[in-house]
């Protein structure tokens, strides 16, 4: 457990020069390359070697929830129970200090427009950004009210070169959606900013400081209870309530994965194929420091 004295980045810097490999670095890729303007400069929110993200800005930051219940696409059923997810997530994020905005049933163009507008805002006084999407999905695509779109449309505009006021800050994406139609039958296991600091400036990759959490692994089904909400959101909200101000986010998400994997099993006795199925979330982290939603200090 971390106490109120946890260091959020106000540490004495250590003058460690950027590691070089003596030349000869090559990329493991074919074809032409494009650059993301590496010479752009953004404000340094935390010392170069700080172990924790600075979560002591004036505001925690924006939390955006795209909640999809109904669709114009005839093949997609209404997502009964998603409002439970949206309400529970909104409540727990507010307790962690986020400014939460919920958007129900937006069309693809509306989502894209709001994402771009958010990226153009000044996030200098914010700790981080959080985006959650509750919807139907398939492998490599999510559904808006009217059509599908690629998941990376959600974070494309928030890379450090496009949104410099979030450079060096956590950008978190939680996606509750199927990633395919494969089922997991499981297996039984038996017992046999700191201004004025002496730290020098440093460069970071534009895709650093992202975390993307999908409710299930690529190609697989994601389960939702029509009364209690989706398994992933139930577990995420419970862990955020229990230890959101104490555990770092990757440790917390490890226990979310544990809860989904062990505590949930589909109950569909009328369908042998769908009955007693399992699920586990899939976490991709480009975070470069530990992230803890510690209690906000007064400013």
UniProtKB/Swiss-Prot annotation:
Q: Which residues form the propeptide?
A: 1-28, 185-195
Q: What is its EC number?
A: 3.4.22.-
Q: Where is this region: Disordered?
A: 1-45
Q: Would the keyword Hydrolase be found if you checked this record's keyword annotation?
A: yes
Active site residues according to the UniProt entry: 136, 178
The UniProt entry, under SUPFAM superfamilies, shows:
Caspase-like
An example Gene Ontology cellular component term from the record? cytoplasm
List, alphabetically, the Pfam families matched: Peptidase_C14
An example Gene Ontology biological process: proteolysis
PTMs?
A: The two subunits are derived from the precursor sequence by an autocatalytic mechanism.
Q: Does the keyword Calcium belong to this entry?
A: no
Q: Name one GO molecular function term.
A: cysteine-type endopeptidase activity
What residue stretch is flagged as signal peptide? none
Which UniProt keywords are given for this protein, alphabetically ordered? Answer: Apoptosis, Hydrolase, Protease, Thiol protease, Zymogen
Q: How does it assemble?
A: Heterotetramer that consists of two anti-parallel arranged heterodimers, each one formed by a 19/18 kDa (p19/18) and a 12 kDa (p12) subunit.
Q: Which family does it belong to?
A: Belongs to the peptidase C14A family.
Q: What is known about what this protein does?
A: Involved in the activation cascade of caspases responsible for apoptosis execution. Inhibited by the baculovirus anti-apoptotic protein p35. Cleaves p35 and nuclear immunophilin FKBP46.
What is this protein's record name? Caspase-1
Q: Which organism is it from?
A: Spodoptera frugiperda (Fall armyworm)
